[in-house]
Amino acid sequence: MNISLLEGKKVVLLGQNVAKLEKLAQEYGEPAFRGRQIHEWLYQKGVRKLEEISVLPKLWRTTLSDQGVCTGRLEEVKRLVANDGTIKLLLETSDRESIEAVGIPTNSRLTTCVSSQVGCSMGCRFCATGKGGFQRSLEVHEIVDQVLSIREAFDRRPSHIVFMGMGEPLLNIESVLESISCLNNDLGIGQRRITVSTVGVVNTLPQLAELALAKLGRVQFTLALSLHAPNQHLREMLVPSAKVYPIQDLLSDCRHYLDITGRRISFEYILLATVNDKVEHAEELADLISGFQSHVNLIAYNPIDEEDYQRPSLARINRFMTVLQSRGVAVSLRASRGLDQDAACGQLRHQHTRLD
């Protein structure tokens, strides 16, 4: 009998590594290779239901199902396909919460944008996710499933993973790091192709560095800090959490993170027309991050309902980039994908929730 079941804990197969699945099999009196078979069918074949793992003895499958063991796969409730090939999925959890995952294809790569929470509590003024409120953090299998679901939608393995969907990853550090371990070791996606984005949460950056080293052995994923403003006053207007986490304290923690991990930090900066996209803002930003081993990723705003912010003109975007480049800042502009299908973070869930 499975010890975990005797303790009354829910047993979800997705998110568990080979060793844990082998142990599970042995706790039921099955040989260890049964655990390896479950692992193969979960991660390579992408099976959704336990009864579909036909290589397992039928009696054991029935026993597992009767005792509440499940794969942990989520249900796809809606799919949007943009003209550029971007696919956004609305997935439903076992407790009927909705989360989003987005697949962004190019010729050579498939980037999957995953959510770490149901909703978000950070309240960034320009973001649709917070409009629907915060419900809870996601479990490991719910994060990993998003990658498998995008793989199914495109019939190819995602090459890159970005934790830039719904939620604040650093408010769910344990599950995020465990899911990174699973994506790396069980799905074969290299850490260097994984990015974790944060708006900044007090005391979490040093914790992230230390926990990542403990759980992953080494830190190779990229940390992306969603800065969005070059000074404290403007950041407080756009990112309410900045009121309790001053920008200089945030950057000090970034330096500490860099010292521990040795990994370059990427700064995310969403451009809002006439709000934070002026020449003086670009100059301030260059001053603010001088001395960092960093890269600035500019994001042209995707308009959402209920907010008056606008997307800057291409001329204003190019001017902002030129100022940064003239100051020696490594900068890129994220290509806007899925604009015709509400691909901005949180839009699909927000609309679905309002309809319900």
UniProtKB/Swiss-Prot annotation:
[4Fe-4S] cluster binds at C120, C124, C127. It is found in: Cytoplasm. The lineage of its organism: Bacteria, Bacillati, Cyanobacteriota, Cyanophyceae, Synechococcales. Its cofactor is [4Fe-4S] cluster. The keyword Signal does not apply. It comes from Prochlorococcus marinus (strain MIT 9211). Belongs to the radical SAM superfamily. RlmN family. This is Probable dual-specificity RNA methyltransferase RlmN. Reaction proceeds by a ping-pong mechanism involving intermediate methylation of a conserved cysteine residue. It holds the Pfam family RlmN_N. One of its GO terms (cellular component) is cytoplasm. Disulfide bonds join C113-C345.
